[in-house]
């Protein structure tokens, strides 16, 4: 059975170092897709690079935890900025869901304005779209527009509640992250997916060159390690040997 493998690099637009790392991993590695933060400091640079790479799938990385929102969000921001206090608000069930739905629509329009096309799919920074309160908003938004959505099926409480016309991969992995970033780790993810009989799989990654913006991230130098592994010739060969076809969310 042919299986579609989407290797999606998150954080396109975060910084020039991030952008260049993603492009390197696409041109000379196994990355096939990326998702962009429309409020990132280097989003215009990302859009410029993407115009030179029309086959690179570019989706939208919905942001509710970093930088300035596109719309006014007094119920979520502090001093005009987004931040990780969203987790506490989710636990307390005090999220401003109307503001979040409006911000999603505004970020989507910003993406179209910057990239000149609709995104191939949606996911989110720090997986906030998988919060139980936010997921229905994003899932309905994606289904109405006919675009795919990253779904961590281990997190969805009731898969039966998903819109019937919502597109996603059968499998998703965020395990290529952290301290163990190796070719062996990547291949274990593929083998586990194949064992489950999944016809499509998304593997999340964050390849980057380190610059001043990336240095401020809690996840910094491992991004360089990811880049090294993802551009390995042996990894590309091992993926092909396992019968995976590289693809984007337009292929599912």
Swiss-Prot record:
One term under GO cellular component: cytoplasm
Substrates-to-products reaction catalysed: N,N'-diacetylchitobiose + H2O = N-acetyl-beta-D-glucosaminyl-(1->4)-D-glucosamine + acetate; diacetylchitobiose-6'-phosphate + H2O = N'-monoacetylchitobiose-6'-phosphate + acetate
Principal subcellular localization: cytoplasm
Subcellular location: Cytoplasm
One function term, GO molecular function aspect: deacetylase activity
Any one of the GO BP annotations: chitin catabolic process
EC numbers for this chain: 3.5.1.105
Similarity section: Belongs to the YdjC deacetylase family. ChbG subfamily.
Official protein name in the record: Chitooligosaccharide deacetylase
Species annotation: Salmonella heidelberg (strain SL476)
Record gene name: chbG
